Amino acid sequence: MNENLKNKNILFCDLDGTLIETISGDTFPKGIWDMKLRFDVLDAIKKLNPEYELIVSNQGGIENGFVDAQKFSKKLFYIIEAIGDYCDCECYAMYCDTNNESDPYRKPNTKILETLLEDYVEDFVNTDFEN
């Protein structure tokens, strides 16, 4: 891991139930439309003033056929843009679409966190914007 990351304010957040919740009140959304941003959480995030917000999520419903992967990707893109804009930070996300608990990308395993740091934050930190 890059030494420059030690000086960065990076926040990892879970998606469902933390950053968003269903409008219907059900545990699982009825469709991609059944969600609302949790502004109480977003306001708390703004106070932390992170440079990066990295969203992680288990989405086993994709593997089970309950959730369409393309529709979920569009929903996630909207969430990333909305949160990044509202919290004024770089926002990225990654999800695991399997229910296999031994998958290194499935939370609580750490590969998804490591990959987000390597692919987004570390690349950004190492970019030479002057040349």
Write out the residue ranges for each language-model feature.
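Substrate-recognition element of Asp-dependent hydrolases with the DxDx(T/V) motif
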Residues: 41-76, 90-102
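Short helix-terminating capping/connector loops at secondary-structure junctions
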Residues: 4-6, 48-50, 86-90, 123-131
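Active-site neighborhood of HAD-like aspartate-dependent phosphohydrolases
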Residues: 1-54
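Short, function-defining helix-loop hinge/capping sites that tune catalysis or transport
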Residues: 22-24, 66, 117
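Two-metal-ion acidic nuclease core segments, chiefly of the RNase H-like superfamily
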Residues: 75-93, 111-118
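Conserved Lys-Pro-Asp/Glu-containing loop-to-beta segment of HAD-superfamily phosphomonoesterases
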Residues: 10, 105-131
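Alpha-helix N-cap and loop-to-helix initiation/capping positions
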Residues: 32-37, 67-75, 107-108
